[in-house]
């Protein structure tokens, strides 16, 4: 689970949890690989809003108004540290957004670490809404965002 190391322990998923999430009907996940070494570079994944609302976790109140929308909740867009600051997060995010739009979704929703990850979403047109200053007791500020797809 190479990507889990990027996150606070309170936010890390077990392999079983991640497999369950990615096995949800309608989940959309993409991975980026280094073509020369075939090493993983990044991942992005999300599930339909109805599936995200099955959890009773922090931030779910942000999602309630969207329960009947064609919305995808993005759990993660992550680039391994050695590949960060090279524009690859933007490429990965763009591809994931394209796949989600192609599947017929109208909205992307998520909670992203502020300011870095939130800035990536804002660069694609996301609006930052609610702020969560101690997301899952990590001491980190996360912002809820909404991104309308064209």
Model-derived features with residue positions:
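Short amphipathic alpha-helix that is part of the acyltransferase structural core
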Residues: 1-45
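Conserved acyl-donor/pantetheine-binding loop and adjacent beta-alpha core of acyl/acetyltransferases
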Residues: 39-76, 84, 135-138
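Residue-level recognition of the GNAT/N-acetyltransferase active site
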Residues: 75, 80, 113
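Conserved acetyl-CoA-binding loop-helix of GNAT-fold acetyltransferases
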Residues: 79, 85-98
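Short acidic/polar active-site loop segments enriched in Thr and Asp
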Residues: 106
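Conserved acetyl-CoA-binding loop of GNAT-fold acetyltransferases
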Residues: 122-131
């Amino acid at each position: 689970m190479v990507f889990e190391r990027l996150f606070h322990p309170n936010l890390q998923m077990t392999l079983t949890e991640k497999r369950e999430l990615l096995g949800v009907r309608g989940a959309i996940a993409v991975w980026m690989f280094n073509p020369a070494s075939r090493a993983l570079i990044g991942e992005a994944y999300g599930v339909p809003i109805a599936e995200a609302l099955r959890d009773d976790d922090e931030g779910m109140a942000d999602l309630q108004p969207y329960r009947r929308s064609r919305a995808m909740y993005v759990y993660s867009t992550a680039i391994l540290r050695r590949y960060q600051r090279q524009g690859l997060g933007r490429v990965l995010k763009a591809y994931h957004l394209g796949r989600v739009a192609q599947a017929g979704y109208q909205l992307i929703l998520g909670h992203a670490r502020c300011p870095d990850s939130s800035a990536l979403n804002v660069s694609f047109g996301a609006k930052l809404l609610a702020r969560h200053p101690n997301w899952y007791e990590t001491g980190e500020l996360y912002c809820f965002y909404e991104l309308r797809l064209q």
